[in-house]
């Protein structure tokens, strides 16, 4: 186990559990991911992302759990998956020092402190990993709340990447690249 399960309190007083994701969570995580993919104005996805199967999700979780520089954390409320954060460390020898972060949560749990909790736990874990030196992420320029969250956690804007998605899919298809030196 890379991270011990721990209970946290959201700004609303609701208790959530943050723990590592397991292969057995594949179906529940996939269901939650589909919900926030379909309801978010900011996630940049392709139609193939919605074609992911439970078996695909299980393989992905297994690979993350096998990689010592990767981590998948789930946030649960009343036993239900409400969000996740994953840090994918590269398996390539020349890229071992970097990790890519991805996070998502159900709309009703946004702006309640869940993103801050998940980000804090994954950054603390990454700082304990001797091979990781920098964390990277990509966020829609229109997602001002997420950008504020990442900046508050110490991430710096490194650049932009235009035209990642059709304009009708997101408010602004330009993506911001951010990094955090550990």
Predicted region positions:
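Acetyl-CoA-dependent GNAT
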Residues: 11, 37, 49-108, 119, ...
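Short acidic N-proximal helix/loop "leader" segments that mark the beginning
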Residues: 1-12
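Conserved GNAT acetyl-CoA-binding A-motif
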Residues: 119, 126-138
């Amino acid at each position: 186990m890379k991270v011990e399960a721990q209970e946290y309190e959201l700004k609303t007083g609701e208790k959530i559990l943050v723990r590592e994701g397991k292969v057995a969570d594949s179906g529940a995580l996939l269901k939650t991911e589909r919900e926030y993919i379909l309801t978010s104005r900011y996630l940049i996805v392709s139609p193939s992302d919605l074609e992911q199967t439970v078996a695909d999700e299980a393989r992905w979780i297994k690979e993350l759990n096998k990689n010592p520089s990767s981590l998948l954390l789930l946030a649960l409320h009343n036993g239900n998956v409400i969000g996740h954060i994953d840090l994918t460390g590269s398996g390539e020898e020349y890229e071992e020092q970097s990790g890519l972060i991805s996070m998502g949560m159900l709309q009703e749990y946004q702006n309640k402190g869940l993103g801050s909790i998940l980000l804090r736990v994954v950054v603390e874990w990454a700082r304990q990993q001797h091979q990781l030196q920098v964390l990277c992420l990509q966020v829609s320029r229109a997602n001002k709340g997420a950008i504020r969250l990442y900046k508050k956690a110490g991430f710096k804007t490194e650049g932009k990447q235009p035209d990642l998605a059709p304009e009708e899919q997101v408010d602004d298809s330009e993506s911001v690249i951010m990094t955090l030196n550990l």
